[in-house]
Amino acid sequence: MNNIELLDCTIRDGGYVNNWKFTDEQMKKCYNACSIAGLDYMEFGFRNIKKKESIDKYGPSYFSDEEYINNIVGNQESTCKIAVMVTINDFDINDFVPKNQSKISLVRVLMAYHGGKNKDDLVLDIKQLSDGIVQMNQLIELGYDVAFNIGRIDKVSFEQISEVAKLLSQTKIKYFVMADTYGSVDNDYIEKLIPFVKREFSNSQIKIGFHAHDNCTNATTKALHALKYGADIVDGCVLGFGRGSGNAKTELLMMDLNKNYNKNYNFINIIEFGDEYLINYKECTNNLCYNVVYALAAYVGCHVTYAIDIIEIYDKMKVSDIYNIFMELKRLNKHMFHYSSLFKELYVKLKHN
């Protein structure tokens, strides 16, 4: 179970929110947070063809060229590998240098509509897929690991999945990733889908992945359920920050994987990045809005009133300080009930350090 991997796609998926106009500082902070956290991959963005109309409209992580990535990463050494995404048959293989000249490890090739240009769910566009495999093989020859990401997985029949598996099993791609594009996949379907896909790819070394959307506020649960039923890698975004309803929350995935899969992710830096650059916990003051302070309280096992006080009464605190106070309450065995005077004492002590 310790072979499970986690990919953070905050920048690539969250780019739909701001047209990929992240500052260099945000990018560097995100990569640093992912590195310290021990994440397996950070997806820097798309690698799209540079067209004038696109350059005018979108920020640099829409293109994620070599110069841009090199500028963000610099000489930083990290076990967190870099990924980019391309759209099947809609990218230029010449935009990729050999892997030994690039900081990119993984290229994810997206086929959003299995029916091709007609977008007909009853049809599997074999030509689109076959042409895409040619380019995937070219990427592999350049030295990259390759993931094939298929969208709208609930619209792809099991028979079509079998056809896709037969073609992809003949390649050396590393991952087959399914996207819950409309957020409509539920856990019952996951229990059927993941084992079926595992069987279809059983004669290959290809790992299975799942990308969940949060339309029904259950993306994190679905991602974890996919892991329970055999997925090898799942995607997440910091605080769920992504297109539309968002995605599975990277920090919650990390917490669960630490508890149940013997992982040792450092999620504090991830949360601090989100708190500083996406939305801080003081802006989420009612229970209709996800607030990560409650997640931290749950992870440690602290009484909810401590979290409420932090959000509603006390001045803004660093996420690491919140976590340390929770851990100190637990050490003192005062975490399960609300001791307001003790909490105030710990808070004042923290402020004066």
PLM regions with names:
Residues 1-353:
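Catalytic cores and adjacent flexible loops of soluble metabolic enzymes
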